Amino acid sequence: MLKQAKGRIGRNAVLLALFEEEEEGKITAHLDNLQWRYCKGKVGSMELQKIVASVETAAKRNNVVNGELYREMHALYHAVVEAVQGVTRGQVELGDLMRTVGLRFAVVRGNPYENSKEGEWIAVALYGTIGAPIRGLEHETIGLGINHI
């Protein structure tokens, strides 16, 4: 069974991605209390590969995942792609369609289930803007991907 709302991994990833730096103290303290690993970052691109690379690099540098363990990187990759599908409304294309994104991202890793035997999960939240590569013509977007490790 899932933990109570404050222990839900996707919810926490979305909140971390949404909060500005000056607002995030409460959520990071909560994640520390849960003993979950997390990181934040920003990426702007017209290419999916750059989004994936930015999230993976941040997660490795902040010890959210071990870059030498295939299963951890594979779980992260699928969570990122699922989140991008939300951002792009299921059409995982950017530059070819003359779309660009400016995103904040959060990666959260932990055990969102009351039964610890369910294992660790990873969530990737993306929040920002998407649109034509003309400043001011974009709109807000959000995506969430969750995968087991």
From Swiss-Prot:
Q: Name one GO molecular function term.
A: mRNA binding
InterPro entries, sorted? Regulatory_HutP (IPR015111), Regulatory_HutP_bacillales (IPR023552), Regulatory_HutP_sf (IPR036482)
**A biological-process GO annotation:** L-histidine metabolic process
How is the subunit organization of this protein annotated in UniProt? Homohexamer.
Regarding protein family, the annotation reads: Belongs to the HutP family.
What does it do?
Answer: Antiterminator that binds to cis-acting regulatory sequences on the mRNA in the presence of histidine, thereby suppressing transcription termination and activating the hut operon for histidine utilization.
Q: What protein is this chain from? A: Hut operon positive regulatory protein
